[in-house]
């Protein structure tokens, strides 16, 4: 193995969170790419599908205290393990159409909660990057309710306000 500071092995963490049920992860690697799935907080992803294939929307939830405590603990484990992290928050991990909350304001609310909590600010020393994510299939900004150019501009602006400038 050739030493390559700042590069090396990447670990992908498929991190599924739900109201009252966000696990603590303990990953390592030079870079831990965290896909943080918050679909269980979104009516567009936590509903039910009838036998005829009709989707019935669920309920939108704010991100809860356990979410923040346990994601922080997971980030802290990465710091302890000498890892850097890259993050994408998303409402979908399976390629589902329209996984977002009922309103775009709720998407913006989730971003504002992350900012107000200081989650990214407190770990900016180990953050390699934060993807805008959130909307569309896999958080890739296609196949969703809020993937028009206008919504993307609002999303980028909200994320620029949320993510520490140093990142």
Located regions from the model:
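N-terminal substrate-binding region of glycoside hydrolase catalytic domains
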Residues: 1-71, 94-96
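Structural preference for beta-strand elements that scaffold enzyme active sites
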Residues: 31-33, 82-86, 127-131, 167
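Extracytoplasmic/secreted envelope proteins and their assembly/folding machinery
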Residues: 68, 72-75, 108-111, 115, ...
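N-terminal/domain-start segments enriched in small and hydrophobic, helix-friendly residues
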Residues: 71-94, 98-105, 121
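Acidic (Asp/Glu)-rich catalytic clusters
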Residues: 20-28, 73-82, 117-124, 159
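Active-site neighborhood of glycoside hydrolase catalytic domains
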Residues: 111-113, 147-167
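Active-site groove signature of glycoside hydrolases
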Residues: 86-97, 114-149
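Alpha-helix N-cap and loop-to-helix initiation/capping positions
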Residues: 59-66, 99-110, 146-151
């Amino acid at each position: 193995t050739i030493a390559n500071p700042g590069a090396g092995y990447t670990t992908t963490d498929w991190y599924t969170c739900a109201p009252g049920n966000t696990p603590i992860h303990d990953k390592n690697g030079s870079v831990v790419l965290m896909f943080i799935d918050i679909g269980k907080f979104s009516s567009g992803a936590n509903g039910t599908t009838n036998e005829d294939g009709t989707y019935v929307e669920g309920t939108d939830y704010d991100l809860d205290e356990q979410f923040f405590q346990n994601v922080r603990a997971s980030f802290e484990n990465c710091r302890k393990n000498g890892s850097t992290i890259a993050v994408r928050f998303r409402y979908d991990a399976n390629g589902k159409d329209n996984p977002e909350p009922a309103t775009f304001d709720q998407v913006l609310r989730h971003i504002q909660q992350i900012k107000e909590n200081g989650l990214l600010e407190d770990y900016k020393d180990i953050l390699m990057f934060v993807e805008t994510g959130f909307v569309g299939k896999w958080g890739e900004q296609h196949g969703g309710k809020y993937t028009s150019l206008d919504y993307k501009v609002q999303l980028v602006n909200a994320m620029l306000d949320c993510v520490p400038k140093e990142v």
